[in-house]
Every structure is written in structure tokens, then in C-alpha cells.
């Protein structure tokens, strides 16, 4: 989205001249390499779930949704680099119709990546909550049918929101909507965590009898959430500063780190699959089978 994800170099030149902070420029090869790795890793996660019937359950479907979100974020950067390469070599007319349309599609993928991650983490949090505090009713509450319906609604909403944000990208309310979803997701999950903590204190004996995997899933969610905040929060702050104080020297100084903030987003897609593999023995076994070329039963 041109107004939301326009790089730092489009910031007011006068403001940049008044800042003592030089632009931090990273080679495009770094972005491209990280993005390729992110796509391949998350594709492996998707293939593992598709090919292994033991992994075809609600929890792993939610993880697949998060993997798709991460993959879209990586594809965004790959396609952007390809578009820039074609333009620099004269294959595309600068600011032509094709480039503008391609820009909009690529920007929509970026927004889908953020929105998809937000909602995927939220449903994973809800799933973990039900697993811990409604363990006996879990399979009647979280059915495959409800899981598929939930994910379908989420991605339809994300796609519609992404298209709308691209169309109205130059309006401040759009930026506020884009950035507000991030803290709203954190508030939702924080409320779940507080409720889980309060219930845990009053039902300590009951929770101690739960399977270890249930509690392990909650810890995995905490790690995923921490990585997501660490990787995306700097960029969200960049967008807010670019919108509300683009000429302030301190804001401009922070915005000089744009490419580092962008690299953190790419790293999120690379880190998540390692978390899945490290925390899930089932997924780890599926990876081993894939790489050892064993046939799935």
C-alpha cells in the first residue's frame, strides 16, 4: 500500500537533511534470500500437513493459516524485487498501468500477510484456551467443519480488507485502521491470557491433570506471539511516525531504520517454521519423513 508501506526514501527531503541519522541501506540480495527461505520453509509446513493425515486437525489447520500469512509476506518482497528489476532494465514503463496494477496486487499481499497473521494468532489463542479449560468438550466445540468455516471467513474478511486498504491507502483513517488491528489483537490475546491465569489459580488441581501437550501448545503460542510482536512492532511504529510526524527529526531518525524493520518482517516468516518443528514432535516427525523420502501411511 503506497501510503502505508512507502519506503523511508519517500519521506520529506528537508526533514531528512535536518536529521543526523543516515539511512540504513541493506543489499536487496539479503531481502531476496531471506524471502526465498521463508517461502520454502512455510511451503514445507503446508506440505507436511497436507500429506500427513495425523496432522489434519484444527490446531494444525490454524498453524497452516499462519504459515500462509508468513508465505505471503515473503512472496510480497520477492515479487517487489522482480518488479523493480524489470523496471530498472526498461522492461516496464515507469508508473505505467501494468506497474501500478502490479504494485496494488503486491501491496495487497503485504496487507494480507499482516491481517492473516493477526487473525491466525488470535484463533490459535482461542483454540489453546478451549484446549486447556474445556478439554473434555474440545472435540465437540472445535470441529473440523467449524475450523474450515472460521478460516474461510477470516480469509474472506482479510482479502476484502486488503483490497479496501489499497483503494483508500492515502486516507489517514485507513492508516489508523491498519495500525489499530495490531494492538487490538494483542489486547484480545492478553485478555485471554489474564482469564487463563485467573482460572488457572482457581482450578490448579484440574489443570495439573491435563495432558502435557495441552500446556505445551499454550507455550508455543506464547513464543509465536512474542516473535510476531518483535518482528512487526517496529514497522507498525514506523507507519505511525510516518503518518503523524514525518518532519520531526527524531521521527525521521527512527524512520531511517526502515529497511531493518522490513528485514525483521521477513525474518518472522523464517523463524516461525523452526518454532513449529522445535515445539511439535508430530510436525518434526513429518519433516523427517519428507526429507528421508519415506512414504506416508
UniProtKB/Swiss-Prot annotation:
Q: Which cysteines are joined by disulfide bonds?
A: 21-253, 245-251
Q: Which residues cross the membrane?
A: 24-49, 59-79, 105-126, 148-168, 181-199, 218-244, 257-278
What GO MF terms are annotated?
corticotropin receptor activity
Tell me where in or outside the cell this protein is found: Cell membrane
**Which GO biological process entries does UniProt record here?**
adenylate cyclase-activating G protein-coupled receptor signaling pathway
Mapped to this chain, the residue ranges on the Cytoplasmic side of the membrane are: 50-58, 127-147, 200-217, 279-297
What name goes with this protein? Adrenocorticotropic hormone receptor
Organism annotation = Mesocricetus auratus
